Amino acid sequence: MDIGVDLGTSNVLVYVKGRGVVINQPSVVAYEKNSKRIIAIGNKAKKMIGKTPESIEVVRPLVKGVVSDYTVTERMLKVFIRSAMEKRTGVGRPKICVCVPSGVTEVERRAVEDAVYRTGAKSVYVMEEPLAAAIGAAVDIEEAKGNMVVDIGGGTTDIAVISLGGAVESQSIKAAGDDYNASMIRYIRRKYNLLIGEQTAEKAKIAVGSVYERPEDITYVVKGRDLIKGLPKAITITANETIEAFADTTSHILTAIHGVLETAPPELVADISVNGIV
């Protein structure tokens, strides 16, 4: 393979053989509503979220790991992949490997494959994300040994028990990073009567987000609009507060992990008890 693409709900990563990861950009596109002209893609488009006039639409063309807007996804991929192709040392049309969530349907898989082909690929190989994550973590997936991979992305969490080069048991759930952001927004609105945006929630999540109690309770200042007075307001939240905010999403992910373990062969579960979870 010449190029590897991780087509995520939140970010697109493009790897070029011999060069490493050359693109790591948000899966966000901004375009004019009337003309459909693309204004910005990636980081530039993400900075526009919540700040555009009515004439401009900012979208995430992938929702919960699935292509929701085929045309915009294709145009976004063309920009990223063609930029990556300029960094290649080889010539000719590239062979491209693209990752998809383990739970996608054949129709969804075909949509991704077709979109990548239209960027100019010679051939396209579609790989499930848990297998790619395991390989990236230096796990020998061909070994006759059970390894569990939990890949928490932006739109989906992919869970798989891997052995002999394949996923023996797997599940993809629509609970992941974006849900933690939404939980943060709801929690701050409910507790502090403060309305914050998606980007503010994500920054707070990265800064102090936690799913277990920390020895040192770090803090972060969140700014938004007071829902009672309608004026700008700043509050301070703690890491331990986010445990409560994230409880539902965390519980959903843990339940799915338990479910995959319960249906996996006992011998592989025994291996996982020794190897742990990647």
PLM segments and residue spans:
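Nucleotide/phosphate-binding catalytic cleft detector across ATP-hydrolyzing
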Residues: 1-152, 160-278
